[in-house]
Amino acid sequence: MEREVIGFLAHTKNIKKILSYGLNPKRSEKMKKIKRNGVLVVISSPSGTGKTTICKKLIANDKNLYLSISVTTRKKRDKEADGIDYFFKSKTDFLKLKSEKRFIENAIVFDNYYGTLKNQVMDKLENGIDVIIDIDWQGTRQINDFMKGNVVKIFLLPPSLGELINRLSSRGSESLKEIDFRMSKAIKEIKHFDEYDYVLINSDVDEVFKKINKIIY
């Protein structure tokens, strides 16, 4: 595992830091300090790394785990359903929600607006339900500030940039230009890995699933 990380992030000055994630027992103390209403877990990764698949697998495995549904202005893709995958809104409706301070976080990603409704998250936490939010590093910063640090942050990495290109290409939903843009953005996103509590390489969905379960529970 260490060899994989070094190969992927050879340019990084914080190799020792990333290798310590998930290995340092002191990090589990953060979970114990969080007030046990519900635990808020943020999972971030570059597009195509598999976080959506892993989040759905976590939810299917635990009825007391809720996957927050984001509001977005982007167009609905084939097989996506409103209220299940996202709450699809017009730009006007989104900005109205923002002006009413209804979001716990919001950001512009690939020229589209995304946001997480405050009541959707807080109501669940107050009722003892653990919540997972699938967002980027921008949203993670906002949520961390709002929750005063009472959030567990997990960042997923692909096995390699080459594998990430293959995953994006196999989806068949992006043009070559869009894939190139996403790859450029992925490299920028990866630079924020050290803002997270845990960094995991997603070379095997089942293995990452097990590791995240250990982190949460």
Q: What residue ranges belong to the model's regions?
A:
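ATP-dependent small-molecule kinase phosphotransfer cores
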Residues: T72-V131, W137-Q138
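NTP-dependent small-molecule kinase module
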Residues: I15, K32-K35, N166, S170-E174, ...
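Hydrophobic anchor at the beta1->P-loop junction of P-loop NTPases
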Residues: I43
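Conserved phosphate-donor/acceptor-positioning beta-strand/loop module used by diverse small-molecule
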Residues: V131-D136, M147-S169
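Extreme N-terminal, non-catalytic leader segments
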Residues: N14-L23, R27-V39
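Conserved lysine of the Walker
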Residues: K51
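The conserved Walker
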Residues: S47
